[in-house]
Regions:
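N-terminal, Lys/Arg-enriched amphipathic/low-complexity engagement segments
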Residues: 35-91
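Short amphipathic alpha-helical segments
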Residues: 55-58, 140, 432-436
Length: 496
């Protein structure tokens, strides 16, 4: 994105209250206290059985360039809220913390840490907004694309959403996330250049309208392109569009590669059957039928149930905007902080809403898989010093309905949170996009089919270790007692 500032940075891509909190921490001398934050979401998107984690590469690029520029400082100075000494601190700011994260393409689930940030209180606070912005959007789009891939089977899926995305960055990074999730190619040329994603495209209705005739338009296109997919619904699909596509394909013969036709309107199930019939009768049995027009996984599922003869799916608006759930709701919570004695103490947020009660302490997520077939038994959230990978058997129980439990034997425990930055240094080698996509496919394969259902999937187990569970209950009791005592004292003081 171009800027009027030559030294523009993403450092101010944050909420004002992050800067305000940094100022408070700085003025009260706690800004260098060690802290640990964890990012997670509370509910799986689209009522899906899993989510696909995406956005790590952009987080890495963001952290690598995290500096307040001269114009950043000048702008903050102009707000009139911040003393020069604090601005001098910001001017010399560098991220020296550590980040652990799920890798891109990883299957992730509700209420488990996706990203863990450990560093000074100030630096952990500063990056919250951008981190959530990135993870919320890209994970959402990757998951939506995975749902589309799940119902489309082996059919090619093309990402066509650029013009409907919420601006340039959303289109570019949304395309990348969609490719991770399951799309085979994109219409976005810049995304193809930036990420090496295969590009694909046909032509618009404007081409046909410009020549005022299907035949003339298709002929002109065939004269300038070898690979041809003709858009046949500008005027009349069955009377003009397809017949003229067939006519041009026959006239040009081997001079072009007649890939097929695209339908962008009408009853897709009915029309695709009629179009297939016309193409087959003309001898073009290998020509494909492409479909677009506000498609998503639900539409594709219904069209397949109706026997639609569609071979290639072009998915636009409803994918790139996550149309039916445009927000993931990932949050970023403080789980541990250094006390006045230099000791890390656990902290948590409690609420009358059970789903908003956070889990205290630095944690690791372990993926538990059966050695017999590699299938996932569930995820196991444990405190950082616990090592379930060294146990012969593992007791797993539901964190709310504790009577739902099982003992797992002959298993492998794999840590989900991997080191990305260590004391400000990048220690993770970013994989190629094709490697991320292949990794995602492997993880999907390890998931039971019951968790992959588009409608009403079985709930994947995300369990707490006994130690984590006990510590959470103890922390809740301790905080409530502390609040009670302070409330009593406050009431006495107010009564004076």
């Amino acid at each position: 994105m171009n800027s009027i500032y030559k030294d523009d940075s993403l450092t101010l891509h944050t909420d004002l209250y992050q800067i305000n909190m940094m100022k408070t921490y700085w003025e009260t001398g706690v800004y260098e206290k060690k802290a640990i934050f964890e990012a997670y979401f509370r509910k799986l998107p689209f009522e899906n059985g899993y989510a696909i984690f995406a956005g790590l590469e952009r987080i890495v690029r963001y952290i690598e360039q995290l500096r307040f520029s001269k114009t950043d400082i000048d702008y903050l100075r102009g707000l009139g809220h911040y003393p020069e000494e604090f601005l001098a601190y910001l001017e010399n700011f560098e991220f020296k913390g550590s980040i652990r994260s799920a890798v891109e393409g990883e299957l992730v689930f509700a209420n488990e840490p996706l990203v863990q940030v450990e560093g000074t209180l100030a630096e952990c606070q500063l990056i919250e907004t951008a981190l959530l912005n990135i993870v919320n959007f890209q994970t959402l789009i990757a998951t939506k694309a995975s749902r589309v891939r799940m119902v489309s089977g082996d059919d090619p899926v093309l990402e066509f959403g650029t013009r409907r995305a919420q601006e340039l960055d959303a289109a570019i990074w949304g395309t990348r996330a969609a490719y991770i999730g399951g799309c085979d190619a994109t219409s976005n040329v810049r995304a193809g250049k930036m990420f090496g994603i295969p590009v694909s495209g046909t032509h618009a209705h404007a081409l046909v309208q410009a020549y005022r005739d299907d035949y003339e338009a298709f002929k002109a296109y065939a004269e300038s392109h070898r690979d041809c997919v003709f858009l046949v619904d500008t005027y009349d699909i069955l009377k003009s569009g397809v017949p003229n596509a067939i006519r041009v394909a026959k006239e040009f013969g081997d001079k072009i590669n007649f890939l097929g036709v695209r339908i962008d309107s009408g009853d897709m199930a009915y029309m695709s059957k009629k179009v297939r019939q016309q193409l087959d009768e003309a001898g073009f049995t290998k020509a494909k039928i492409y479909a677009s027009s506000d498609l998503d996984e639900k539409t594709i599922l219904n069209l397949k149930m109706q026997g639609a003869k569609i071979d290639v799916w072009g998915i636009g608006t409803r994918l790139i905007t996550a149309y039916d759930q445009p927000a993931l709701g990932c949050v970023y919570k403080l789980v541990s902080i250094e006390d006045e004695n230099g000791v890390m103490v656990d902290t948590m947020k409690i609420s009358n809403n059970a789903e908003k009660v956070s889990t205290p302490g630095k944690k690791q997520v372990w993926r538990i898989t059966r050695n017999s077939d590699g299938k996932s038994e569930g995820d196991y959230i444990a405190l950082w010093d616990e090592r379930p990978d060294q146990l012969d058997e593992l007791f797993m129980f539901h964190p709310v309905y504790t009577y739902i439990n099982k003992t797992v034997k002959d298993f492998t425990a794999r840590p989900i949170l991997q080191p990305i930055f260590n004391n400000g240094k990048l220690v993770y080698e970013l994989p190629k996009l094709q490697e991320i996509k292949a990794y995602k496919d492997e993880q999907i394969e390890a998931l039971w089919d019951e968790y992959k259902r588009i409608l009403n999937p079985e709930q994947y187990p995300v369990d707490l270790s006994q130690k984590t569970y006990d510590q959470k209950l103890a922390s809740i009791a301790e905080i409530r007692e502390e609040v009670r005592l302070k409330a009593e004292q406050l009431a006495k003081e107010n009564a004076k």
